[in-house]
Amino acid sequence: MLFSYDKTLGTVETSQGTMTLTKVFIPFFLEMFLMNFMQTVNTFMLSYFSDNAVAAVGAAGQFSSMIYTFYSVIGTGVSIVLCHHLGAGKKEQTSEAVFSALVFGAALSAVISILMSIFARPCMTLLNIKGDVLDDAAKYFSICMQFSFLPALFVIIFSIFKSYGFPQISVGISLGMNILNAALNYLVIFQPFPFFLKGVSGIAWCSNISRGVALICIIICLFRLPLQLDFHKMRPKSLLKIKEILRVGLPGGISSLSYNVSQTVTTSVIALVGVSAISTKIYVSNLVFYVYVLGLSLGMSTSLLIGWLCGAKKYDQAYKLNLQNLKVTILLNATLSILLFLFGRPLLSLFTKDPDILKVGCALLFWDIFVEIFRGFNHIEENSLRGAGDVVFPMIVSICSCWTMSVLFSYILGVKLGLGLTGCWIAFAMDEAFRGINYFFRWKSKKWMKKTVV
């Protein structure tokens, strides 16, 4: 049967107890849903300030995401290594992995913080934004980058929590952080009383303050949870574990970096259409993320379970779990993206009353139906391959696809053929389809069974 569902496939016995797909999925979903909800609230508030401010913060955020990809290399690597070792019952090597990831992540983020804060404006000029938008984007980016060690440690420590089966910790901390950030943004934008932070720079400082408070909570949890980490036994040679972490994390990081750079280039292409096009993309992206987040949450949950299963050599269960979750994700993505298209105009009207933005935005929501259906393949198949330790193949496919399908055809369809944002969205659908289908057949080939770390 096409939609038969076997709950036992999503159940894994680990040293931390019995883990189920539901137990892992709900915290993943809540964390990303709440984070995006707060981002939507912030965008909603920022739109009252000006559409230019939305464009500036959105452009800087796009570049920031590219920088944060360096940190995801460590987070992804340590997650795969920990899942495989925990699944195999090899606890003694987990402390070395955690210790190495934290030390290397702190050092890397310190270097990036210095470089990016110095070269903030040149980085923003690469996005083809000008005038006040460029000034605000450079200011926002510089302030955020001065404290980029905060998201670096978030990514790494949250990956550690999730690998040990404690994703709910990330949910609570993320919720608190985003509520604090939204409250501070409200004070900055609406100034209900004289507040010392103002404008786009104030928004950037709000982000840093809320992340700083959250980091304190994260560090406390790291040392109070029953992770059985023996940091006092660590020696300089323990840092050699970073080689294993980078070996499995780097291909995924290169893939993510390539994707984020391509998205940055695409944003630059969209900027050629006009500033309103950037604002439209940001408004639409805020809405479609609520479809995106379901598939991504299920994909990340599947990756975690498959990592544990591969560590325990339960390959048949991992294989069937992937195919089952793929069906669920495609069904959910198709249904939700169609509903979003049907109710697109009133939802977009919450952000702007500009008739041109509303017209283009509604058209994009139609094309996004196809994007989300094929994105379902990517979320499940790519994350499953990475969870199994098969990281090189997805990297190659992703790099080839995002630059030929997404970037090249965004320029051809959007600029040369004059289709604007609609052309870019068609290119996005082509990219998702090419990657998703390739990942699917890679999983069916079962070559990933030979890629387990332990």
Segments (PLM) and residue ranges:
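Short alpha-helical transmembrane segments in multi-pass integral membrane proteins
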Residues: M1-F28, L82-F149, F195-L250, I306-V371, ...
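Transmembrane helical elements of multi-pass membrane transporters/channels
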Residues: K23-N42, I143, M177, S210-A214, ...
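Transmembrane alpha-helix boundary and packing residues in multipass membrane permease domains
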Residues: F28, M32, T43-F44, G61, ...
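Helix-terminus/linker motif at the lipid-water interface of multi-pass membrane proteins
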Residues: F33, F37-A55, M124-G131, L187-K198, ...
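Small-residue-rich hydrophobic transmembrane alpha-helices
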Residues: T43, V54-I114, P151-S170, T267, ...
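Interfacial/gating helices of multi-pass transporter permease domains
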Residues: L46-S65, D132-D136, V200-G202, K241-V248, ...
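Short runs within selected transmembrane alpha-helices of multi-pass transporters and secretion channels
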Residues: G75, C144-S163, S170-N181, I203-I218, ...
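Structural signal for membrane-spanning alpha-helices in multi-pass inner-membrane proteins
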Residues: M116, S159, N185, I189, ...
